């Protein structure tokens, strides 16, 4: 499968060191705080918060950290920041479109760190709308294949808003509108199919195929951007073939 799933897998393998792990913890904690502020601090009445807490637990974030973030967000405890979501747009090496999603309490710091990472790694900032039109936010749910067939998964989620089920290596990926992810998770639970992961992200309509050396430049840019604590996600329209992925993972 081209695009997201394959290079996300590669990226996750690259991220398995302590520094990356610490930053991932910080991002998960921030998401819990924002979810609690937006929809209330009761996970049973706030599906987004419930999902963020589950993701944090799965990533082994300590329960105390999770609970403090929930309380800060809900106002039960002082110290919550005024988080804002900001999108930045630009181009990486080889004209690859880059969409950068930040969650920050300091717009000036976020803009400065994103601009510096882009300029030092062959990227250029772009005006709002210059690349975002190429991307669409999609919901996704991942399930482990195990003994399942694509038809098994499709039959379970067809009436829940699923738009597509595709092969993603050792998993099946279900795509939908972002608002249908919860219904799809519920449908899978009813069919006794375990969910590995779910979220929403941005997918590009038009992809740029890259060779391994050019892909490495984009990964360096992504790594530099993700050094900023304000950067939550980086999306690109690069496309990596199985051969290129194998070379990157070698």
Curated annotation (Swiss-Prot):
Positions of region (Disordered): 1-22
* Name of the featured protein: Probable transcriptional regulatory protein DIP1378
Q: Which UniProt keywords apply?
A: Cytoplasm, DNA-binding, Transcription, Transcription regulation
User: Does the entry feature the keyword Cytoplasm, yes or no?
Assistant: yes
GO terms for biological process, alphabetical: regulation of DNA-templated transcription
Compartmental location: Cytoplasm
Q: Kindly indicate whether the keyword Transcription regulation belongs to this entry.
A: yes
- Cellular component per GO, a single term: cytosol
- Family that this chain belongs to: Belongs to the TACO1 family.
**PANTHER family the UniProt entry points to:** TRANSCRIPTIONAL REGULATORY PROTEIN YEBC-RELATED, TRANSLATIONAL ACTIVATOR OF CYTOCHROME C OXIDASE 1
Annotated source species: Corynebacterium diphtheriae (strain ATCC 700971 / NCTC 13129 / Biotype gravis)
GO function terms (MF aspect): DNA binding
Q: Which Pfam families match?
A: TACO1_YebC_N (PF20772), Transcrip_reg (PF01709)
